[in-house]
Amino acid sequence: MSAPKKVVLAYSGGLDTSIILKWLQTEYGCEVVTFTADLGQGEELEPARKKAEMMGAAGIYVEDLREEFVRDFVFPMFRANALYEGLYLLGTSIARPLISKRLVEIAEETGADAVSHGATGKGNDQVRFELCAYSLNPEIEVIAPWRKWELGSRTKLIEFAEKHQIPIAKDKRGEAPFSVDANLLHTSSEGKMLEDPAEEAPDHILQRITRPEDAPDTPEMVEITFEKGDAVAINGEPMSPATILTELNRLGGKHGIGILDLVENRFVGMKSRGIYETPGGTVLLEAHRGIEQITLDGASGHLKDSIMPRYAELIYNGFWFSPEREMLQALIDKSQEHVTGTVRLKLYKGAARCVARWSDHSLYSEAHVTFEEDMGAYDQSDAQGFIQLNALRLKLLSARNRKFNGS
């Protein structure tokens, strides 16, 4: 394959992608167009633009994608109550499809030969970026420098940056920072002492969540209103998707909610450890589960729960644009037609707890479930036949076992 003449680079302005920008220019002698997505990572993006200009980028795209990110990616995922391996809210995974989508679109708009990313050859992101890109354009070339160059460690990367006078960010203690990924849904931290799972993560790693021990001593109540499975208002005030998640991040972070220390199984086969901060997402998940409790019938809810692990795994592994994810999404979205109503939660020292929920679409019938007189709403004698029919199989099995086992 001939060397590319123009490459669109997913560019954060950080150490890795700044080195990649320089490397692409020198390795291929090509033009590099940078694309920086504002997904709510909380950073000022103008420095990334200026850095790209300083390093000779042929074109620079900086786009605010926060609303699209939450509306078209985060919210559909939360309709499923998706958790990878029962714990991880998929904050990094769900951002990759949107970034890949815009990379491919910009490549097509600018006539670029290839796209490039800063994911390492050991991680999941390389798979996610590339599977998404190929799903959208089967002819696109993807350049993954970490799988090509000799800079095989963060130490060598820093040495390269110093040699080429590329600025290196430092943390508040004057050290190179953890490997961090951030967006409106979460912040993840990896590397350094976190690579030893037997060592407790230091408190200074937290960037958006107060330590639960330092959170307010007074609980705070918050009400979240849903329409067809998506949050639409907080405390009665309608808000856009990104605004809702921003406000829930503020509330959850204030009360120490959403810290996860996780050792997970990467798609590429190894285990890795990360510290995940997902304040708003943790609150939103508890609220969504709360409204489903009264609006979703039992069989539908159990079916939905049974497919959730597979759905979460597809997102984690980079198959957002696959037909199987879309088929599962159609089932999930169908289940949300009546998931409309309001949930009240109590936020307190690391926990978000649903304490009340109500809806015009509720299936909860106090007349049927009451311990008091139900005025004929439920005939308890109906349970006799129900039990006998369900017991028939068990009785037949038991009779056979007694016949052949003598007991």
From Swiss-Prot:
Localization (cell): Cytoplasm
EC number(s) on file: 6.3.4.5
SUPFAM superfamilies given in the database record: Adenine nucleotide alpha hydrolases-like, Argininosuccinate synthetase, C-terminal domain
Enzyme class: ligase
Major localisation: cytoplasm
Binding-site residues, L-aspartate: 120, 124-125
Coiled-coil intervals: none
List of residues binding L-citrulline: 88, 93, 124, 128, 179, 188, 264, 276
Record-level GO cellular component terms: cytoplasm
Biological or metabolic pathway of the protein: Amino-acid biosynthesis; L-arginine biosynthesis; L-arginine from L-ornithine and carbamoyl phosphate: step 2/3
A Gene Ontology BP annotation from the UniProt entry: urea cycle
Residues binding ATP, per UniProt: 10-18, 37, 118
Family in the record: Belongs to the argininosuccinate synthase family. Type 1 subfamily.
NCBIfam families: argG, PRK00509.1
Subunit text: Homotetramer.
Listed HAMAP family: Arg_succ_synth_type1 (MF_00005)
PANTHER family: ARGININOSUCCINATE SYNTHASE
The protein's name in its UniProt record: Argininosuccinate synthase
Species in which this protein is naturally found: Jannaschia sp. (strain CCS1)
Gene that this polypeptide is encoded by: argG
